[in-house]
Structure formats: structure tokens, C-alpha cells
Amino acid sequence: MNLSAAHHQISLSDGNNIPLIGLGTYSDPRPVPGKTYVAVKTAIDEGYRHIDGAYVYHNEHEVGEAIREKIAEGKVKREEIFYCGKLWNTEHVPSMVLPALERTLKALKLDYIDLYIIELPMAFKPGKEIYPRDENGRIIYDKTNLCATWEALEACKDAGLVKSLGVSNFNRRQLELILNKPGLKYKPVTNQVECHPYFTQTKLLKFCQQHDIVIVAHSPLGTCRNPSWVNVSSPPLLNDELLTSLGKKYNKTQAQIVLRFNIQRGIVVIPKSFTPERIKENFQIFDFSLTEEEMKDIDALNKNVRYVELLMWSDHPEYPFHDEY
């Protein structure tokens, strides 16, 4: 794979391309107003052409404003930018899918997006509330029919509102549900999952490669250490001694080593940052490469432990992480 800062796209099975690095725009807690706008502009100036967002991040309007401004400046053309949006759990009902995508397009003020994915395979009670709860504070689940939801996504593609379709946090069984669906029109081209040296996803990666599905790694640098939703029993990834020593060898940060590891495996990375220096640093991964031996050594760091377990929803019938992969 001959990658450079200017050319770092890989092909999707539907004929479209996806840049191997994108800017993640999720923040917990929510970013201060204006912060996402600045981050996206910084990223585009630096050479990023892929922005990963979602309705539930509450900042798609800022992402759109930044993209449109950079297009108006002549820095980029719309077709050079790759935006991924996500369908949230409360909108899996087929009749709600198109309006959900249209709301994203309205927030972005764009005519189409490049990739629309089902954010999680777990449906919640349909409606306006993002986290619908019962009187005991528990999330109200809904019966999931992933195939019906997928058909509604296919209709969005037919309407020209999105170029590619994918999923996120799906296990093998859930991917097979879609892949084996009678009358399947468009295959999922991506599966966005947690993936990094402590959680290498080798089996899921192999399965996805067999079906021409690209893995997009969320939390590619590990995550924040918020114990309310993060498994903090696994040590912070970026403190690892091997990554530190490789960083010294290549004059790179541990984060750059980790990101390089995944892109050399053909995995797309979407590190999130709202700090201009970090946004720039994360992109500087095209001027070195790891040896085969180093790749094996990093791969051997795998602990098979997730940071993002979503245990609060582990009793959902479609909770994806009970299965081995």
C-alpha cells in the first residue's frame, strides 16, 4: 500500500473510496460551542478529507459549516470530502430512517453524505428522546429488525442522499443477517468497531475482509477514562512500553505508532480530537512505516479487552458483545 498525506484512500466494495484517516467529532461531555467548527477547519487545512460525525454528537451543524467554508475558500471540493453520519437507536423503524438522514443533511447543509451507518444494532423505543427511560430510569428497548432498517437505508441510497452504506458495532452474526438477507440490494461496505493494539479484532477483521467490508476503528487510541462508560480495568494504551520505544526509534508519539499500525492493516482510523496540535500530530503518519516484525510485536500486545463495553445495555436482545466476535 503506497500511502501519502495527499493520497491515502482505499477502495470500498461499492466502487467508492474512503480516506484511511478521519477526524472523529464525538465528545464526552459535549464540546463547547464553536470547538467542533474550529477542529474540522484545522483538520481540513492539515490534509484530512474524512470527517466522522453523528446526529447524537449534537454538532453536525458546526461540521457542515466548517466543510462549507473550506469549499467556499477553494481549499477543497465537495467530492474530496468524505462525511460519515450515523442512524441512532431510536430511529430504526423503517419509516424514520429517511427523515433521520434528511435531518443530518439539513444540519450539515449538504446535498448528500458519503457514508451512512447504523450506529448500534440495538433499537430503543422510537421517538424524539435519545435515551428513552422508564420510571426506574432504565432505557426502554424496542424490537430490532435489522433487515428492515437496512432496506430503509438502501432506499436512502437509491434516492441519492448517500453514496455508501455501512454499520457499526455489529458482530459476525449481525453482519450475516444483512449479508444473507433475501433481496439484498447493497452490501454494507464498512463496520465501525473499537480496534487498537490492546483489542486487535483479528477474527472480525478476517471475516470482514472475506466479505469486502472495511473496518473503521473508533477509539483507535483507546478512550477517555470515564468509569461510567469505559472499562478502566484495561491499562491506558498509550502508556505501553513497546509503543514508547517504537516512538523513540521513529521520532513519533505513541499515538502515531498506534494509528500507523492500524492503517498498515488496511483499517481506517478516526481519532477524535479538538486540540489543533493533536489533530495535526495524528495526521503525521504517512512519512514512516513499521517493519513486519514490529507489526507482529504490536499485534502481540492484544489483551482482547474492550474499553467501550456498553454494559448498561448488555441485556438488550441484540447486544453485540456477548458473542466471541
UniProtKB/Swiss-Prot annotation:
Q: Give me the reactions it catalyses.
A: 5beta-cholestan-3-one + NADP(+) = cholest-4-en-3-one + NADPH + H(+); 4,5beta-dihydrocortisone + NADP(+) = cortisone + NADPH + H(+); cortisol + NADPH + H(+) = 5beta-dihydrocortisol + NADP(+); corticosterone + NADPH + H(+) = 5beta-dihydrocorticosterone + NADP(+)
Q: Does Transit peptide count among this protein's keywords?
A: no
GO cellular component terms? Answer: cytosol
- Gene3D superfamilies reported for this sequence: NADP-dependent oxidoreductase domain (3.20.20.100)
Activity regulation behaviour: Subject to inhibition by high substrate concentrations. Inhibited by testosterone concentrations above 10 uM. Inhibited by the primary and secondary bile acids chenodeoxycholic acid and ursodeoxycholic acid.
Task: Show the InterPro entries listed in the entry.
Answer: AKR, AKR1D1, Aldo/ket_reductase_CS, NADP_OxRdtase_dom, NADP_OxRdtase_dom_sf
Carrying Phosphoserine, the residues are 228
Which residue spans adopt a coiled-coil conformation according to this UniProt entry? none
Q: Where is the active site?
A: 57 (proton donor)
Q: Tell me its EC number(s), please.
A: 1.3.1.3
- GO terms (BP aspect): androgen metabolic process; bile acid biosynthetic process; bile acid catabolic process; C21-steroid hormone metabolic process; cholesterol catabolic process; digestion
Binding residue positions for NADP(+): 22-26, 52, 168-169, 192, 218-223, 272-282
The GO molecular function terms of this record are: 3-oxo-5-beta-steroid 4-dehydrogenase activity; Delta4-3-oxosteroid 5beta-reductase activity
Annotated localization: Cytoplasm
Q: What does this protein do?
A: Catalyzes the stereospecific NADPH-dependent reduction of the C4-C5 double bond of bile acid intermediates and steroid hormones carrying a delta(4)-3-one structure to yield an A/B cis-ring junction. This cis-configuration is crucial for bile acid biosynthesis and plays important roles in steroid metabolism. Capable of reducing a broad range of delta-(4)-3-ketosteroids from C18 (such as, 17beta-hydroxyestr-4-en-3-one) to C27 (such as, 7alpha-hydroxycholest-4-en-3-one).
What name has this protein been given in UniProt? Aldo-keto reductase family 1 member D1
What's the source species for this entry?
A: Mus musculus (Mouse)
Its organism's taxonomic lineage begins at: Eukaryota, Metazoa, Chordata, Craniata, Vertebrata
